[in-house]
Amino acid sequence: MASITMTTSFLSTTNLTKGSPRITQRRLVVANAAKGAQVESVQMSGERKTEGNNGRREMMFAAAAAAICSVAGVATAEPKRGSAEAKKAYAPVCVTMPTARICRN
């Protein structure tokens, strides 16, 4: 569960506080260099923000769905009670406890 709570720290955006003038100078140099090259305009939409708000919920739903599928897979993989396959698979149980549900119909 710790990995789920850690995702918020990795996926959230960070706000940079006002730093030293040297960092500001570097940004200015990078911005000036970018003006010389062709820069494509990028449009940000509100859809990204909505997706970020539901990230944890979607992750929990995915985990729950995976758990349900794994339990359903185990349930369907079990042999029917009282069948020859069940008696063969659970032979030690059927010998020690002949009245066990898996050994009888």
Curated annotation (Swiss-Prot):
GO biological process: photosynthesis
Function: May be a component of the oxygen-evolving complex.
Chloroplast among keywords: yes
Keywords: Chloroplast, Membrane, Photosynthesis, Photosystem II, Plastid, Thylakoid, Transit peptide
Gene label: PSBT
Localization (cell): Plastid, Chloroplast thylakoid membrane
Organism: Gossypium hirsutum (Upland cotton)
Listed name of the protein: Photosystem II 5 kDa protein, chloroplastic
Family annotation (InterPro entries): PSBT (IPR040296)
FT transit peptide: 1-77
Entry PTM: The maturation of the PSII-T precursor to its final form occurs through a two step process. First, a stromal intermediate is formed, which, upon translocation into the thylakoid membrane, is processed to the mature protein.
A Gene Ontology term for the protein's cellular component: photosystem II
Coiled coil (UniProt feature): none
Main location per the UniProt record: plastid
UniProt keyword Thylakoid, yes or no: yes
